[in-house]
Amino acid sequence: MTRKYFGTDGIRGTVGQSPITPDFALRLAHAVGRVLRRTQERPTVLIGKDTRISGYMLESALESGFNSAGVDVVLLGPLPTPGVAYLTRAQRASLGVVISASHNPYPDNGIKFFSAQGTKLPDAWEEEVEAALEQPPVWADSASLGKTRRLDDAAGRYIEFCKSTFANDLTLRGLKIVVDAAHGAAYHIAPKVFHELGAEVMAIGCAPDGLNINHQVGATHPDALVRAVRANHADYGIALDGDADRVQMVDAAGRLFNGDELLYVMVAARLARDEHVPGVVGTLMTNMAVEEALQRRGVKFMRAKVGDRYVLEELQRQHWLLGGEGSGHLLALDRHTTGDGLISALQVLQACVRSGKTLAQLLADVPLFPQVLLNVRLNPGQDWKTNPVLADAIRDAEAELGAHGRVLVRASGTEPLLRVMVEAREAEQANRCAQRMADAARAG
């Protein structure tokens, strides 16, 4: 069944345009509430959000929709996406709801859901919700309407959970760390986590005004972090995105490390302690150098579709624990049920502290292949798959690269973009092939 509203990470779009409107949010919550009440007499849902100004409007609409279906609501306020996932499980709630468009700019927003176990929900559940949306509302009678309360210590509970994933015998004392929260959901949480574990913390991107989320800061704009690390002679820099489910890191020299590299560090740290790591899941975008390095160490590697939900599904199928994406969505299922930027950063810092090595030293044997990613904006209704010029360009690039590189062309699941990725042993070759395909896509 083709889904009408749900994409790869919930429902997302521009505020004020369908489906990100208050009336749709109310109808959506009512439909979700009806689905929940098919199996539960009195469901409870948690609602968290990032710092976009539109979050207030959507939060109120969702609250009303759930209450009208006989569902109780607990408001968490601004909280990272993984914090909502954790509290949904810890509070024994029926469902977790996040109002966020992650790394997108403030005019966008979105709505996504977590199961009672704190995991992303399957496509089948989303299809059930979409079917319920097509039915007329059935309002609960007055005696059965839901109620709403606020969990005032939600942030503090999540901070303690994050700290609990860091080894008790280690400390961050003596380290200077720059933390960039992208003016997003972790603005009041991330600096405290690292400070309470002993680090000297300098915070940037921690002054949200409702309009500046992800603006020239955070994991998708790491230049600000690189400058701050160098200017303050810090040991590390940590950049989160707007909802803090992804992370990028910087070392004292200002070198940026992406999710592929951080995932390898997490795996290598476990191998160094003789922990069994049977396999790791990446995506179609994961750098070939990481795959080869893991295989040299006897660790199986599998590629899932792009999107942390698909990495999670493959991990569950294989009964493995570790996976992630180059974008910084990293999963360690014995630490958390979903990708968590803060916990991932703590796992990497733990590896550095325990080994006494820097990130560059831990990754000395894993030089990444040059990888070029170009985004081509698609016109409404444009079908890139039927573009013969692009098809020829893809075939030519694959023939030129052979076994020494990769080509991936795919539509974004969250934006009207065509993503063109080329990986090769030489940067010039990767750039040339990627540009040819991007030009062909624009010509179509």
Curated annotation (Swiss-Prot):
<dbReference type="GO" id="GO:0004615">
    <property type="term" value="F:phosphomannomutase activity"/>
</dbReference>
<feature type="active site" description="Phosphoserine intermediate">
    <location>
        <position position="102"/>
    </location>
</feature>
<comment type="function">
    <text>Catalyzes the conversion of glucosamine-6-phosphate to glucosamine-1-phosphate.</text>
</comment>
<dbReference type="InterPro" id="IPR016055">
    <property type="entry name" value="A-D-PHexomutase_a/b/a-I/II/III"/>
</dbReference>
<dbReference type="Pfam" id="PF02879">
    <property type="entry name" value="PGM_PMM_II"/>
</dbReference>
<dbReference type="InterPro" id="IPR050060">
    <property type="entry name" value="Phosphoglucosamine_mutase"/>
</dbReference>
<dbReference type="InterPro" id="IPR006352">
    <property type="entry name" value="GlmM_bact"/>
</dbReference>
<dbReference type="GO" id="GO:0005975">
    <property type="term" value="P:carbohydrate metabolic process"/>
</dbReference>
<feature type="binding site">
    <location>
        <position position="245"/>
    </location>
    <ligand>
        <name>Mg(2+)</name>
    </ligand>
</feature>
<dbReference type="InterPro" id="IPR016066">
    <property type="entry name" value="A-D-PHexomutase_CS"/>
</dbReference>
<keyword id="KW-0479">Metal-binding</keyword>
<feature type="binding site">
    <location>
        <position position="243"/>
    </location>
    <ligand>
        <name>Mg(2+)</name>
    </ligand>
</feature>
<dbReference type="InterPro" id="IPR005841">
    <property type="entry name" value="Alpha-D-phosphohexomutase_SF"/>
</dbReference>
<keyword id="KW-0460">Magnesium</keyword>
<dbReference type="InterPro" id="IPR036900">
    <property type="entry name" value="A-D-PHexomutase_C_sf"/>
</dbReference>
<dbReference type="GO" id="GO:0009252">
    <property type="term" value="P:peptidoglycan biosynthetic process"/>
</dbReference>
<keyword id="KW-0597">Phosphoprotein</keyword>
<feature type="binding site" description="via phosphate group">
    <location>
        <position position="102"/>
    </location>
    <ligand>
        <name>Mg(2+)</name>
    </ligand>
</feature>
<feature type="modified residue" description="Phosphoserine">
    <location>
        <position position="102"/>
    </location>
</feature>
<feature type="binding site">
    <location>
        <position position="241"/>
    </location>
    <ligand>
        <name>Mg(2+)</name>
    </ligand>
</feature>
<keyword id="KW-0413">Isomerase</keyword>
<dbReference type="InterPro" id="IPR005845">
    <property type="entry name" value="A-D-PHexomutase_a/b/a-II"/>
</dbReference>
<dbReference type="Pfam" id="PF02878">
    <property type="entry name" value="PGM_PMM_I"/>
</dbReference>
<dbReference type="GO" id="GO:0008966">
    <property type="term" value="F:phosphoglucosamine mutase activity"/>
</dbReference>
<dbReference type="Pfam" id="PF00408">
    <property type="entry name" value="PGM_PMM_IV"/>
</dbReference>
<dbReference type="InterPro" id="IPR005846">
    <property type="entry name" value="A-D-PHexomutase_a/b/a-III"/>
</dbReference>
<dbReference type="InterPro" id="IPR005843">
    <property type="entry name" value="A-D-PHexomutase_C"/>
</dbReference>
<dbReference type="GO" id="GO:0000287">
    <property type="term" value="F:magnesium ion binding"/>
</dbReference>
<dbReference type="GO" id="GO:0006048">
    <property type="term" value="P:UDP-N-acetylglucosamine biosynthetic process"/>
</dbReference>
<comment type="similarity">
    <text>Belongs to the phosphohexose mutase family.</text>
</comment>
<dbReference type="InterPro" id="IPR005844">
    <property type="entry name" value="A-D-PHexomutase_a/b/a-I"/>
</dbReference>
<dbReference type="Pfam" id="PF02880">
    <property type="entry name" value="PGM_PMM_III"/>
</dbReference>
<protein>
    <recommendedName>
        <fullName>Phosphoglucosamine mutase</fullName>
        <ecNumber>5.4.2.10</ecNumber>
    </recommendedName>
</protein>
<dbReference type="GO" id="GO:0005829">
    <property type="term" value="C:cytosol"/>
</dbReference>
